[in-house]
Amino acid sequence: MKQYQKDLALLLSESRALFFKEGLSLKDGRPTPYFVNFGLFRTGRLISELGRIMADYLVDHELQSQFDVLVGPSYKGSALAVATVEALWLNHQVDRRFDYDRKEAKTHGEASQSAARFVTGALEDGCRVLIIDDVVTTMATKFDRLSPLTDEATARGHSYHPVGGGLDMDRQQTTAVYEQQHPGGPGETGQE
């Protein structure tokens, strides 16, 4: 196990973001004995540590040169994107841009004529985009992130190149958690 993986496990425990309880269910309806709430990473130290862990992961897998912009979906992914690019710079001297989406397009101020769905303007024509988020269950939400990117590119007359996604926690289980309550068998997931 890599040090950043150990650090994540300790951070999940310390922050109580990982907890166990009967009667929990995932967004797709599957029962689960545990849940992870990255919303509890709500201090400067915790989000900074989480960003460092993600930056270390990206560098360990040699992904830091594979993207230009790190996009974090609203809401939890936004803070994660900022913390990760900051840690890439501070710990690895890798400078990358970040952006995150709005739930509704902005039509005033600097976005008066563009109805911008992204905040920082980091998405430039031809840029390579890595999407980063906290947890995945079925990947449906992550694939949904491609639509706002495509819409933004079309509105600006640009092209963006999604290169992948980075996650803190993969909830895609390969076997059912409770066989009696979820008789579908290994690998079956509900609709997210």
Each model region followed by its residue ranges:
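PRPP-associated nucleotide enzymes
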Residues: M1-I132, T137-E192
